[in-house]
Amino acid sequence: MEQIIREYRPDVKDSTIGAYVRSLTKLNGLLGENPEYTPDKVLPVIESLHYTTQRNILNSLIVYLKATDNPPSKIKSFIEKRDKHNTQYKEEQMSGKISEKQKPNFVSLDSVREMLEKIKPEIDIIKKMPKAGITLNRANRNLFSAYTLFQFYITAPLRNDFAMMEMTTRRAYNKLSLDEKRHKNYMLFEKNKINLMLNNYKTAGTYGEKTIPMDKKVERLMRNFVKVLGYKTGDVVFPYSSNTLTQLLIRTSKKYINKKIGTTMLRHIYLSDKYGESKLESQADAEKMGHSVKTQQDVYVKDPNDFQPIEDHLENDPPLPDFILADDSPEIV
């Protein structure tokens, strides 16, 4: 299935291929043995799912059916249903109101900062562990990773572009061929600055290579992070798949403030906090985040009056589970 889609759409990102495969796997699970991709079989089993989940499944199915040379007549009903969900999504986003599904986890940017203050004492302990001769376990590494990612995302909320990002230098980066650059994102360390070099991201076909300067406060944290974790040039800084990266953020925020905040929600929070009442500087942020101002205003900016309060919450359950690390993550070629 994956290979068929990859051959049909060779220029699509690995993460997009993975999303197609996950949606089709979910559909196959609902259909049972010997799944039949016909409207009378597919539409009833997905009807109870949220409309955006239905849309994603249908979109993946349409791609697969086209890739396997099915006639337009077999695909027509799926396209019509998918397009209806797309229209619903667009109307919901343009309303300026956060969706009912997202609303419980929609908090202010200050609430995210408060969460990071709760985590900081644990991070201070983790930073001292290597000097004390204590090896960081996966829970330590995951928490430090989540903390560092959150600190960056509240200054420039990218998508999941940190997933499998490689640490490099200016000299090493300049030696890469265009093809080598095209398939990866890099964290470029220089003497007085760190830049993110984005080549493999959702809208790369429109915006090309993007250079994102790192905020100075976050830069200091990032240098400390790579030092404590022992990373060097050529290493993957955040060895998580795209899905695992956002799940790491969601599980961390759930543990500390009982909210599920992933990368998409962070984009809503950041832009709603900044532009919900003012559109100043929106063009600069749209360029940085790799989308148009129209997408920014229509999709991400929400009414800040919908921000939800957070609880004084810290679950007394075991540490965050171990996440998939680099050896289990999709290979980038």
Where are these regions (language model features)?
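Non-catalytic DNA-binding core/recognition domains of DNA-processing enzymes
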Residues: 2-86, 214, 248, 264-268
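Catalytic-site neighborhood detector that most strongly recognizes the C-terminal catalytic loop/helix
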Residues: 276, 287-317
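Basic, Lys/Arg- and aromatic-enriched nucleic-acid-binding interface segment
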Residues: 114-161
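Conserved tyrosine-mediated DNA breakage-rejoining catalytic core shared by Y-recombinases
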Residues: 165-216
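Active-site/catalytic core of tyrosine-dependent DNA strand-transfer enzymes
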Residues: 207-270, 275
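C-terminal secondary-structure termini that scaffold catalytic or DNA-interacting sites
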Residues: 309-333
